[in-house]
């Protein structure tokens, strides 16, 4: 069994990055929800 988390900065940014979130309607909903929660970090 290998470790399931294989870190990659490129994959992290592409899947959970700000621009990816902004590109879809649901992604913008996620960002707004995190803003109202008062999160310091909105996304990767």
UniProtKB/Swiss-Prot annotation:
One of its GO terms (molecular function) is structural constituent of ribosome. It holds the Pfam family Ribosomal_L34. It comes from the Bacteria. One of its GO terms (cellular component) is ribonucleoprotein complex. InterPro entries: Ribosomal_bL34. Gene3D superfamilies: 1.10.287.3980. GO terms for biological process: translation. Keywords: Ribonucleoprotein, Ribosomal protein. Belongs to the bacterial ribosomal protein bL34 family. This is Large ribosomal subunit protein bL34.
């Amino acid at each position: 069994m290998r470790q399931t988390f294989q870190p990659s900065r490129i994959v992290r940014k592409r899947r959970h990055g700000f621009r990816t979130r902004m590109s879809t309607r649901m992604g913008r909903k996620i960002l707004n929800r995190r803003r109202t929660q008062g999160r310091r970090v909105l996304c990767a």
